[in-house]
Amino acid sequence: MARNNYLFTSESVSEGHPDKVCDRISDAILDAFLSEEPEARVACETFATTNRVVIGGEVGLSDQDKLAEYMGQVDPIVRACVKDIGYEQDKFHHETVEITNLLHEQSAHIAQGVDAAENKDEGAGDQGIMFGFAVAETPELMPAPIHYAHAILKKLAEVRKSGEQAVLGPDAKSQLSVRYEDGTPVGVSSIVLSTQHLDESLTSDDVRAIVEPYIRGELPDGWISAETEWHVNPTGKFVIGGPDGDAGLTGRKIIVDTYGGAAPHGGGAFSGKDPTKVDRSAAYASRYLAKNVVAAGLAHRCTIQLSYAIGVAKPLSIYCDTHQTGQVHEAEIERALGQVMDLTPRGIRTHLGMNRPIYERTAAYGHFGRAAEADGGFSWEKTDLADAIKAAL
């Protein structure tokens, strides 16, 4: 039986978190290759530590000369990312960081299983399971804890970059414990915020005085009470941050990237992967389907699972769970979803317009719950499939 009164906690990390620095770099490199060739194959991993960034993985372009040319663009892409994030500290600076590029051409054996032949649809780039989720807790149909944890850090990054609060550093984390009553989020029982600061003399109380107005401004009215616990920089000073403080890797913040633990995760990371990789494209499609089910009024809460096999085009299974909030049986929704959208890798990419350089912007503050953009960014957040789903039932 579902619980109605409880606390649920989610965390977010800022664009300057070491792992997010790596996600950003990997997706920026992906975008560069997609700008040259929409069908480019990219699997880019990044490692960052004190004074060093290492890039590795596989890339493929149809033009070998262009491939060599774009390999040479990795260094300025990395430096541009680090500069935009805001790192200019002694041991991690966009001008002086040492960059090692170990990218190489994609395996022909992988390519032959994925590429479309004359008599065969393009297959999935790997086996795997992917989940999508939506819930009518926020206008974006996202779980409230992760939505507001992201919002706080986005706001702090905004005021840092504008110069309004230049004393803040790029590295930060947030965590919210949200109180639910009758299944509805109504307040925050605790707030955890750790943020890098550039002035060594600042105390935890000083930092709280800086960030508290912005935190209050991002949360709904009435959510913070006298009983809300505040933990701002609870360990004291936080001056050394980013990859100089802790090493970073691409793909280590998969729960931050998705639903904050409110839904299952198939295990595959997103950043640095071109959309032939179903780890990414099918997870985006799953979110798209779940969001449209909720937007159609068919459920208050919806989880979708898709599964794939490498070299096989069609999904092996489509699963829907409306968590006892559905207006129709889940099996009927599953059948309808298979009718209204081509869920092969190419079908997903075509429907959502994914062969575009739209991924660097996804690397921080969540891949979901964002506004669809005019150039095709966050197309999986549209609710333009809702009527078709209802018509197919």
From Swiss-Prot:
K(+) binds at E45. It holds the Pfam family S-AdoMet_synt_M. Its cofactor is Mg(2+); K(+). Binds 2 divalent ions per subunit. Binds 1 potassium ion per subunit. CDD domains: S-AdoMet_synt. GO terms for cellular component: cytoplasm. The keyword Magnesium applies. Keywords: ATP-binding, Cytoplasm, Magnesium, Metal-binding, Nucleotide-binding, One-carbon metabolism, Potassium, Transferase. Residues 106-116 are annotated as: Flexible loop. ATP binds at H17, D171, A172, K173, K237, F238, D246, R252, K253, A269, K273. HAMAP family: S_AdoMet_synth1. Catalyzes the formation of S-adenosylmethionine (AdoMet) from methionine and ATP. The overall synthetic reaction is composed of two sequential steps, AdoMet formation and the subsequent tripolyphosphate hydrolysis which occurs prior to release of AdoMet from the enzyme. Homotetramer; dimer of dimers. Belongs to the AdoMet synthase family. This is S-adenosylmethionine synthase. It comes from Jannaschia sp. (strain CCS1). The gene is metK.
